[in-house]
Amino acid sequence: MFTHGGMAADFNNVKKRISNLGPHFRRRRIVNVKSKLGTEITFEVNWREWKLDDNGICNRPRMLTNLPAGKAFIMPREGTMNGTLIINGSWDSSLLDQNIELQIENGIVIDVKGGTIAANIRQEFGEVAKKLRSKDRENVWTVAEFGFGMNDQARMGGNVLEDEKRLGTCYFSIGDNTALGGSSAVGIHIPGVLTGANVWLDDSQILQDGEFVLDI
């Protein structure tokens, strides 16, 4: 990873690409994600909350960054997400050989399909839920984060830290959203990466079949 892939990116270019994307987020609050595989998701965001500093530039004392860096992300407004989400790239630290289908109502995953991997997901999140108070248990299924990969050298290889940074992908994380200001404090946070998605913010298309349609 340190000599090729996402770590080999020109992070000045990554920073520029993320900065150029920022103006397209202004005053847009409805996100719609679709794919040919069946994803059809709509949710709201507070456009002022987009995180645009995961760019790999870490040149001042006490600055922190992901390795590899390169994503733009936000917390979906709680309770607003509805639809079907098909994860087809990777989940956590595994490349997928079978898609995962998530049914989402009011920001909460209510059903998971997709063979063995889906059964494992249900078990893992179920075990975490058992440790919570009964009124908090469904919060483990909160859709906690949404973002775009912005690193043109990142590759899809089953390492979630790199997979979610691959340019043209988007990702959704399930579980704890407190790091982004949310109320779901559940101690689990796992991302799934989509390839080939179409994404709109209000009536402005951002991704078409996994490629940016904007000049960034």
Describe the role of every protein-language-model region.
Residues 102:
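Hydrophobic/aromatic beta-strand elements that line small-molecule binding cavities or substrate pockets
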Residues 1-97, 105, 200, 204-209, ...:
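Active-site bordering "gate/hinge" segments
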Residues 37, 79, 140, 164-168, ...:
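A short, structural micro-pattern
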Residues 169-216:
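Intrinsically disordered terminal and processing segments
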Residues 95-96, 111-174:
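Dual-mode signal for accessory low-complexity, basic/Gly-rich regions
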Residues 97-99, 195:
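Short loop/turn microsegments at loop-to-beta-strand junctions
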Residues 46, 88-90, 105, 114-117, ...:
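Histidine- and/or cysteine-centered catalytic micro-motif in compact active-site loops
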